């Protein structure tokens, strides 16, 4: 459940700070600028992640977020830059925002066409190179909180 899972993930992040390598806090103004650039409104859990951590790594788990204000000239792990780049290069649908790259052809995205009861988008899989009509958009997590908790637990070896 979104906020509860998110709070559990944050607690684990705080307990294991030696694994944290995050960009750092973003301002509310920068988050709003990112939303405008992507034409979405971020869910509360992802917004809190951006405001608190920005983007970065927990061990080997890299969560995309906001790196800097210049979204056109940024790089990984900037979710805004990478999403805009993929929209241009591979026709990534505008309802998807990339938050994680598996290292292969698969990316995990917030899907703003699949909102849960608290207006939290599901996290779905998008495979580069697969035509849009053949994408399955497998649900990886019901929301960002669940997704973040999964990734943090995976890094810690907790089931």
Annotate the PLM regions.
Residues 134-158:
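Ampiphathic alpha-helical segments that act as solvent-exposed interaction surfaces
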Residues 1-107, 152-159:
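A surface-exposed partner-binding patch
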Residues 109-139:
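Segments surrounding the PLD/"HKD" phosphodiesterase catalytic module and close analogs
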Residues 43, 59, 127, 145-148:
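Compositionally biased, low-structure terminal segments
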Residues 32, 124-125, 141, 153:
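N-terminal non-cleavable signal-anchor helices
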Residues 73, 81, 98, 114-116, ...:
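Low-complexity, compositionally biased segments
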Residues 65-68, 82, 131-134, 143-146:
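Short, intrinsically disordered/low-complexity patches at protein termini
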